[in-house]
């Protein structure tokens, strides 16, 4: 399921590079996109009550799916993909967030309240990207809320995002910070992006 999202992103990047130079190959790629979408990203946790087919007990997995769906819309201009990402986020990602003295963050699973970087970093990025596409202060507030949770509970002073540091959690949080900077023009976000990416390098 989530591995499908990462593999599909590679195909999308290739599509973006060749779509104007090789229409035949671009058409083949677009067919792959449709097959992946129609097959619900090979969602092995799909239940009969899930009308979208993309819902999953693992919150981080749904965040990865949303990022790929958003990327598909950015690459093809087809709104069906980002509209599904919006649906998944609105109904089954942000609704899982819970609050304690450390702040409000996303749990790893529907039945596991632990809140980690591999869930909250891509979740923050999804919220920021949905805000840039649809507007809606709720998405911006969600992105800021998850950013605040990560900085307050997971980010180390040297730029590590939780232990052990993983390139995908470092990268998604760094990109979420960059997106928030471009939305708000507040330098705090760019400074955090620089800290996180410099540590990763």
Each model region followed by its residue ranges:
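Glycan-recognition and catalytic cores of secretory/periplasmic carbohydrate-active enzymes
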Residues: 1-201
